[in-house]
């Protein structure tokens, strides 16, 4: 393939992708982790060495993703909280990834049509919208860039083992990818898969050179389990046979969504049991999975020359998606569309190979068939791009986003509660209240909705109802520090300072790093002229990263004997 054709292919891919994802540039933040990573993340708001150090020693939203968070810090320095800038950056990274994918599969397949097919469907597949249109999922498009780059560097090394610099480069890119998203831990196994594809013998050298990769993968796997440990309990609600069924369901889900990306949703919740049993589609999934396996085996037997590609593609898919197939359960969703960002490349490779086979055998030398084939390909690309373009609008803002989720999951209290939060953020308290009430109709014990109603009553000045709902929230979750803190605020507003201090202390007992409680109890002691005690609480708040008006702190400090 000459350079002009390569350039033309890349320009087509980038143009189609840019059009498909253009709506994301106009999108806002959504109230789903965007606050934790960007809006309320104080560490990105001052680009200092101290904050950079904290970024690399802190997990965000139960994940260790310092490189992704560092990219937000750079953006905040330049663009502040302009959401369009963050969305544009995500799209730029996705465009870069699409180009790298083309390059990678051009090296692997030595076929320009196959690499074009894989790249364009990677670029515009609707299942990948979540990775690009969601600001908080920057880690996906960023880790993929270094992950794929590491693969290409390793392929260069395979061509000439004397070129150790490419092996070193592969390790460096792998490290950066790991610091961006722990899902990169699958790479060492993918390198063995590349060895297989290039028919390299598994000898001593091939194993030794991968030891650094495995050491890094093991370390970051342990780190991921530690930082995401709070998400593991969800799957413990199901028995071992049921979790096994989930494996088959996930495999079937991802396989069918490759060809039929319909009924997409930002969150796919775990199923509710009916009379103690999982829904029928889950029970059926092991049998469907078996049929898929039979199909793949049949193809590999019938088309021997493509057997290596089939094995490579299937193993690539399972190796790269293995960290989120939940052998070690993480997260609150049974499946997630963003998890397919890199894994789908393996399946795209298989499909592209068979499309090429069909083209060569039945289309290539027949003018009419060739025209029909190109027309069909254009229609598929256009319709896929349009589906992606439509899906991008779902991420317009929090209200539209959660309304789409509620449409797909009408019995989910979390959807109503989250849409209520979106209404709350723009000051539409009436709609927020209605959504919180709807959440409680579905689940009367929903902690978030109960707490949020308390907040609404507090804002409206209805302190009696606020106290009632706050106490109700505490009954539902006794270790809810924020609820105690909020109750302390209400007591302070109505002049019950001793009760307020008691509630703030209760909040601190449940969360020793709950900064607002330290600040508020410190302020109460300031009003009571107990400057020693006030200083201790305010100083602790500052040590934890809290912000206090400097005049207040200096006054308390000067009058305190503890300074």
Describe every region a protein language model picked out.
Residues 533-563:
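Terminal, low-structured helical/coil segments at or just beyond the last alpha-helical repeat
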Residues 425, 459, 493-494, 527, ...:
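Register position in tetratricopeptide repeats
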Residues 414, 447-448, 481-482, 515-516, ...:
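Boundary/linker segments of alpha-helical solenoid repeat arrays
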Residues 408, 442, 476, 510, ...:
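Structural marker of alpha-solenoid helical repeat scaffolds
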Residues 1-431, 437-448, 452-455, 482, ...:
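Polytopic membrane enzymes that build or remodel cell-surface glycoconjugates and lipids
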